[in-house]
Amino acid sequence: MSVSVAAEHDYIGLSEFPTMEATTMSDKTKTRDNNNGLNFKATELRLGLPGSESPERVDSRFLALNKSSCPVSGAKRVFSDAINDSNKWVFSPGSTTATGDVGSGSGPRTSVVKDGKSTTFTKPAVPVKEKKSSATAPASKAQVVGWPPIRSFRKNSMASSQSQKPGNNSETEEAEAKSGPEQPCLYVKVSMEGAPYLRKIDLKTYKSYLELSSALEKMFSCFTIGQFGSHGGCGRDGLNESRLTDLLRGSEYVVTYEDKDSDWMLVGDVPWEMFICSCKKLRIMKSSEAIGLAPRVMEKCRSRN
């Protein structure tokens, strides 16, 4: 009668020699993985310098790290291919093969191989559109309200408008040259003895002493003013001494003016253009008070001549 020896099983997972069994199991796992063609050691991520390879990584038949000598259809070119062969691109031979030359003036030439027959054709070069030599003027900006200040905006807009319209400026300058410089207004005050108010007139609007006298009469219609044209007419050259004296005696009021030297003179003693340039103020005074002005007027006219 044979006695069977009970086999001892480790149900908990513990053994007397855990280290040895773990080593044996790892060796068995590595052997099984190598037999199956899997190399997990080579695919582990490790720390190291850029470009360095782990000595434990071994190229297998399934993981080829070296560049294939024959290009595969649809594969991307690496950096060395782009440098060494910059003028051509090559696809793997198959049903259709295309090879093009880059940089030719007539466009890329393409060779197509289909069913053992080769056909080469050249694509027409795409014409390059020439840039317009005359650059279009920038559109004017919309008016800005607020900040920045409007004064600077107006200054810039005026400068741009002047630069955009050179023809109009030249036409304006020619018109101004023909018509002459625009003369400013020459306003002087007019006072009269006995009148409680003053008036102002523009001497540039009158062409002679007669027009000035008529205008002053309309301003002060309640007073009688000596007419410069009643004694033979007073033109643009003024009056002589006898006519000035007759004017003072035959009228109640006469027109005098203050010149640049602050002297009071009778109106009509000098030519009209000289009177306009030298007149600072007009005053209508009584003829009895202006009798002494006539001799002084003639003396001053003689000294000027």
UniProtKB/Swiss-Prot annotation:
Region Disordered, annotated ranges: 96-119, 155-180
The organism's place on the tree of life at top rank: Eukaryota
Regions of compositional bias (Polar residues) in chain numbering: 155-170
GO molecular function: DNA-binding transcription factor activity; identical protein binding; transcription cis-regulatory region binding
Gene3D superfamilies membership: Phosphatidylinositol 3-kinase Catalytic Subunit, Chain A, domain 1
Protein induction: By auxin.
Example GO BP: response to auxin
Protein name: Auxin-responsive protein IAA27
Provenance organism: Arabidopsis thaliana (Mouse-ear cress)
